[in-house]
């Protein structure tokens, strides 16, 4: 059996944020969510989150994930003290305890799986993850023999100058035999510079301690301040971009684009500079997104072009052109072959196949059939000051430039709305509707004014 415990009680003082450190966002997910995901493939029987600072807020945010047990650490008196809080919860548990840090979000699932696998194969009481760092300042040093048996871990602040020359560092990630660990946890002492209980001290108390050296030291980067958060964001973005490049996606200027873990791209997709993807996005084959676009929680079909536009919680069919400077808001559903042009906003509306809204229009709370041609400056006036109302436009209809459709209204199929009209009544199939003042021309007006 396997239990996973994530240390998530710290204040994160150096972040200087009202948000708990483990809830800071990184490429579309919180730090602690990424840590939990790294152990997901192991399918642990127990998942425990040790909380302290703003515990209620952390629990509220993470509870929807399901299957989490929250354990309170109050006060926060070190990593050893945190794990001591698990003793009541794991009473009678027999198996391994994997201990992860809630602020180490770049850890790959393959690394976590290798740690647990090695621990089980070696029969060790504890196996810890280690990394060799060019600059190990601030990290605990791991001392081990040639066979990988660990003799001790000494925190940086407690090291002598000679001990600090060792660059094998403790990543703060452990796989324990829980029964063995539970026996030594009560023996921890605060006899150190910080006066805290260190989980690292249990390593020297256990008969057999082994270590696994991680291949990529960036995986165990911890986050304590905004600069480190930005560094981890850059590393994770690079990892995501490289993954999708290997899957057949072209980035014209990779470092100017950002992705989230929930993105999915088809083959031969091209991403132009300054384009950003947030949340869960699906982009179909042969589409080109950007430059200067934001796609968030949206679905985009094949052979689609999106230029200098914002697409949020919307669905776009195949062979569609969007932009420049279009805004697709939540519940916009754009059918195959549509054209949404410059300075067009679409909200909570369905556009049938082949419909064109080329210029300067607002389409809100509307349903447009197939091959509708919306003239420049057409507005669906959906709000009466109290409620929103629907506009229905049938297939093959046309609206002239600068027309306003005052909802609720139903325009039939093959209907035409004259330019400059304000339409307040339903329009039948095949009808022409004109709703504007008759033009009055006064000859010689300019001369009379003089």
UniProtKB/Swiss-Prot annotation:
Broad class of enzyme this protein falls into: transferase
InterPro entries xrefs: Bifunctional_GlmU (IPR005882), GlmU-like (IPR050065), GlmU_C_LbH (IPR038009), Hexapep (IPR001451), MobA-like_NTP_Trfase (IPR025877), Nucleotide-diphossugar_trans (IPR029044), Trimer_LpxA-like_sf (IPR011004)
Ranges where the record places region Linker: 227-247
Record's keyword terms, sorted: Acyltransferase, Cell shape, Cell wall biogenesis/degradation, Cytoplasm, Magnesium, Metal-binding, Multifunctional enzyme, Nucleotidyltransferase, Peptidoglycan synthesis, Repeat, Transferase
The reaction(s) this protein catalyses: alpha-D-glucosamine 1-phosphate + acetyl-CoA = N-acetyl-alpha-D-glucosamine 1-phosphate + CoA + H(+); N-acetyl-alpha-D-glucosamine 1-phosphate + UTP + H(+) = UDP-N-acetyl-alpha-D-glucosamine + diphosphate
Compartment(s) where it occurs, according to its Swiss-Prot or TrEMBL record: Cytoplasm
Protein name according to UniProt: Bifunctional protein GlmU
Organism of derivation: Synechococcus sp. (strain CC9605)
Upper taxonomic lineage: Bacteria, Bacillati, Cyanobacteriota, Cyanophyceae, Synechococcales
């Amino acid at each position: 059996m396997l239990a996973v415990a994530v240390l998530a009680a710290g204040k994160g003082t150096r972040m200087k944020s009202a948000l708990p450190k483990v809830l800071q966002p990184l490429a579309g997910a919180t730090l602690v969510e990424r840590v939990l995901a790294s152990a997901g493939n192991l399918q642990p029987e127990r998942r425990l989150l040790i909380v302290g600072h703003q515990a209620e807020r952390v629990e509220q945010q993470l509870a929807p994930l399901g299957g989490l047990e929250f354990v309170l650490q109050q006060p926060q008196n070190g990593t050893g003290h945190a794990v001591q809080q698990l003793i009541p919860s794991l009473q009678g548990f027999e198996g391994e305890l994997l201990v992860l840090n809630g602020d180490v979000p770049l850890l790959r699932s393959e690394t976590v799986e290798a740690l647990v696998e090695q621990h089980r194969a070696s029969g060790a009481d504890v196996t810890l993850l280690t990394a060799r760092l060019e600059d190990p300042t601030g990290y605990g040093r791991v001392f081990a023999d040639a066979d990988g048996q660990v003799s001790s871990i000494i925190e940086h602040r407690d090291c002598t100058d000679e001990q600090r020359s060792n660059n094998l560092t403790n990543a703060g990630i452990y796989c324990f035999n829980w029964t063995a660990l539970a026996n030594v946890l009560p023996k921890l002492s605060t006899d150190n510079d910080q006066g805290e209980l260190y989980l690292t001290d249990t390593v020297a108390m256990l008969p057999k301690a082994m270590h696994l050296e991680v291949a990529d030291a960036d995986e165990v980067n911890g986050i304590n301040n905004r600069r480190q958060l930005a560094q981890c964001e850059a590393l994770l973005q690079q990892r995501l971009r490289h993954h999708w490049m290997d899957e057949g996606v072209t980035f014209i200027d990779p470092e100017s684009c950002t992705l989230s873990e929930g993105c999915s791209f088809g083959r031969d997709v091209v991403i132009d500079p300054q384009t950003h993807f947030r949340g869960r996005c699906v982009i179909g084959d042969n589409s080109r997104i950007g430059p200067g676009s934001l796609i968030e929680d949206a679905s985009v079909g094949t052979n689609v072009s999106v230029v200098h536009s914002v697409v949020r919680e919307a669905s776009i069919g195949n062979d569609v052109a969007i932009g420049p400077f279009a805004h697709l808001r939540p519940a916009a559903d754009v059918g195959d072959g549509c054209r949404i042009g410059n300075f067009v906003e679409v909200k909570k509306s369905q556009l049938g196949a082949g419909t064109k809204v080329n210029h300067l229009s607002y389409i809100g709370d509307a349903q447009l059939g197939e091959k509708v041609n919306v003239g420049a400056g057409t507005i669906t006036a959906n709000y009466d000051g109290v409620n929103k109302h629907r506009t229905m436009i049938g297939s093959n209809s046309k609206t002239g430039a600068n027309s306003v459709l005052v909802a609720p209204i139903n325009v039939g199929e093959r209907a035409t709305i004259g330019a400059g009209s304000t339409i307040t009544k339903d329009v039948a199939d095949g009808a022409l509707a004109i709703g504007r003042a008759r033009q009055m021309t006064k000859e010689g007006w300019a001369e009379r004014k003089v």
